Amino acid sequence: DGGRNFLRF
Protein backbone atom coordinates (compact mmCIF):
# COMPACT_ATOMS: atom_id res chain seq x y z
CA ASP A 1 0.00 0.00 0.00
CA GLY A 2 1.29 3.45 -0.89
CA GLY A 3 -0.07 4.90 2.37
CA ARG A 4 1.38 2.06 4.48
CA ASN A 5 4.64 1.95 2.54
CA PHE A 6 6.31 4.17 5.14
CA LEU A 7 5.65 1.50 7.77
CA ARG A 8 8.16 -0.74 5.98
CA PHE A 9 10.96 1.44 7.35
UniProtKB/Swiss-Prot annotation:
Residue positions, PTM Phenylalanine amide: F9
Any Gene Ontology biological process: neuropeptide signaling pathway
Top-level taxon in the UniProt lineage: Eukaryota
UniProt keyword annotation of Secreted present: yes
Subcellular localization(s) per the UniProt record: Secreted
UniProt keywords, alphabetically: Amidation, Neuropeptide, Secreted
Gene Ontology CC terms: extracellular region
Family affiliation: Belongs to the FARP (FMRFamide related peptide) family.
Name the record gives this protein: FMRFamide-like neuropeptide FLP6
Organism this protein belongs to: Macrobrachium rosenbergii (Giant fresh water prawn)
